[in-house]
């Protein structure tokens, strides 16, 4: 190749695109921050002694094609129904049978938004954290939907996420971000700044209180069995913490999770189950460590390209002190957002799948595995 051609090739095919990329990077206003140093600790810090790394081998699928992205799950013991919220706005309930083929899916009500967290009030009503509507109360077998709250301290919710209900009727819930909505949530993760809040709503006084602010994408929340504290998850920094209701003290519950926590559920038998939509991949690890990589990823997302980092999803079982007990996951699994133990089964919701997953914990137990 003549020298002048090779020089032109170098200039137009390498130097010009590089200069354009640098200019776009400098002009883009997205400004990611460094994550706290303790959020970058090894993911092996919370690996338990018992592991099932072939979740999909024994998984059964419930309501295939009828449950579009069932993000959270709540079990109503008296009726035997599982309640969930779907991406099309429907809150549905599922009567589960021994054979998944005999399971019955019913429509309850369409919120007109995106129902995420779901729980039951003390009078049997269905409480929903709707990403676009706020905190909802559904009663009368789906005939009545009431908006309970949509803002706190003058700041409107952008991403109501998870909810749990105390024995005295007080609702505790999270707002993942006051800056980004559900459609934009990846930008909140990539920005690396604490926009999340933990809140309470008292149905008697109608008062919404901010209990904690400046959380890193506040996600799942669960009440302790003695009702003294909450355990809540912060997704990007792979951490769960305790919030003591009397006094407001905060202390670490578990950190260095093997994945990015979403919902957390107490099983009534001394254990919490923490769902993780993705394990700690190399791309995730690098992006969390280096803000400039998150800025590049955010810029790409603005132009319609979002690299998929999600793999090796699963559910971690921990005891009341946050000690890891068992880990159920699969390299080929992604977007698992909740895990609820009902009897001998683990039921899992998802932001991606069109069904609920079920795993028989007796047939497919987690076993000792030397790492």
UniProtKB/Swiss-Prot annotation:
Glycosylation site list: 101, 137
Superkingdom, taxonomy of origin: Eukaryota
One GO process term, biological-process aspect: response to fungus
GO cellular component term of the entry, any: vacuole
Keyword field: Glycoprotein, Phosphoprotein, Signal, Vacuole
Cellular compartments annotated: Vacuole
Alphabetical list of Gene3D superfamilies matching this protein: TolB, C-terminal domain (2.120.10.30)
Record carries keyword Iron-sulfur: no
Protein name per UniProt: Protein STRICTOSIDINE SYNTHASE-LIKE 6
Organism ancestry: Eukaryota, Viridiplantae, Streptophyta, Embryophyta, Tracheophyta
